[in-house]
């Protein structure tokens, strides 16, 4: 239960209602585009091409970052399907609320049963209650990292929720352009990150984060679809998460009832009689 709860919490925090961006269903694309014979590959062969490549990469990052979602508060409801090699759960309901740089609040409900778990995350702590087994978990945020074997911080969780790119750095290389999608790679200290963005407006289609230590064989792939707009914010209402390390975890998330910058509360109490771990 501990790992399942942690995975659900991360999956929810992993990943506008008026004008729907049509036809951008969730669809996978290889990293980078594998058939390069008909596409423009930006290479570095001489000083002129190096300068042009650097200028393009800078513009690419600027346009991608111009789509970053800025907010003070956020709330949403979502449905989750969750699958591992040993278990599968469908139709999980969740409520999520967030105050930037301060709180992430999640309530998870199962069909018929009702609320089964609630969690609140701060920049340095994770508190969760398992209502089914009447257990409270009080942990440093590092605990979630240890359980999931994925290094992240509070800001990374915020970006996962909102749909901003994670582990994006300025070290862009291996850029491949097609009429529909631009693919590129960048490096951080621990990870190599691969990105696909739509060529017309530079919003995320897909990203994949891989551990540089190949012996671990671990990666997280995020796919974004069904973009909707609310007050100029482009929000991916459908997310697919695929986590792989020895075994796999698949999560599908459908967001609805999304609100930005509205008053939110974060109720969290540990009922009497709950054991603490």
Where are these predicted regions, by residue range?
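C-terminal motif of bacterial Sec signal peptides marking the signal peptidase cleavage site
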Residues: 16-19
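Edge/loop elements at the starts and ends of beta-strands within beta-rich repeat scaffolds
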Residues: 66-74, 85-90, 97-102, 200, ...
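An acidic-aromatic
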Residues: 103-155
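N-terminal leader/targeting segments and the immediate start of mature chains
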Residues: 21-79, 85-89, 275-277
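Gly/Pro-enriched, hydrophobic low-complexity segments
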Residues: 22-26, 174-277
């Amino acid at each position: 239960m501990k790992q399942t709860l942690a995975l659900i919490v991360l999956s929810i925090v992993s990943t506008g209602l008026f004008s729907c961006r049509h036809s951008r269903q969730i669809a996978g694309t290889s990293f980078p585009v594998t058939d390069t014979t008909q596409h423009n590959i930006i290479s570095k062969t001489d000083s002129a091409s190096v300068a042009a490549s650097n200028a393009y990469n800078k513009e690419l990052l600027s346009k991608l970052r111009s789509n970053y979602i800025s907010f003070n508060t956020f709330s949403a409801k979502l449905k989750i399907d969750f699958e591992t090699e040993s278990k599968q759960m469908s139709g999980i309901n969740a409520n999520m609320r967030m105050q930037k740089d301060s709180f992430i609040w999640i309530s998870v409900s199962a069909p018929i049963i009702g609320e089964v778990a609630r969690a609140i995350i701060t920049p340095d702590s994770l508190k969760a209650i398992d209502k089914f087994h009447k257990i409270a978990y009080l942990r440093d945020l590092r605990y979630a990292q240890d359980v999931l074997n994925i290094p992240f911080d509070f800001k990374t969780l915020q970006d996962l929720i909102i749909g901003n790119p994670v582990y994006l750095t300025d070290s862009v290389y291996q850029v491949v352009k097609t009429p529909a999608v631009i693919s590129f790679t960048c490096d951080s200290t621990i990870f190599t990150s691969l990105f696909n963005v739509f060529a017309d407006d530079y919003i995320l289609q897909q990203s994949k984060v891989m551990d540089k230590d190949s012996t671990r064989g671990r990666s997280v792939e995020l796919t974004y679809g069904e973009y909707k707009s609310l007050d100029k914010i482009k929000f991916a209402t459908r997310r697919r998460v695929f986590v792989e390390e020895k075994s796999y975890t698949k999560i599908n998330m459908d967001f609805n009832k999304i609100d930005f910058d509205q008053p939110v509360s974060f109720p969290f109490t540990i009922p009497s009689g709950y054991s603490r771990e």
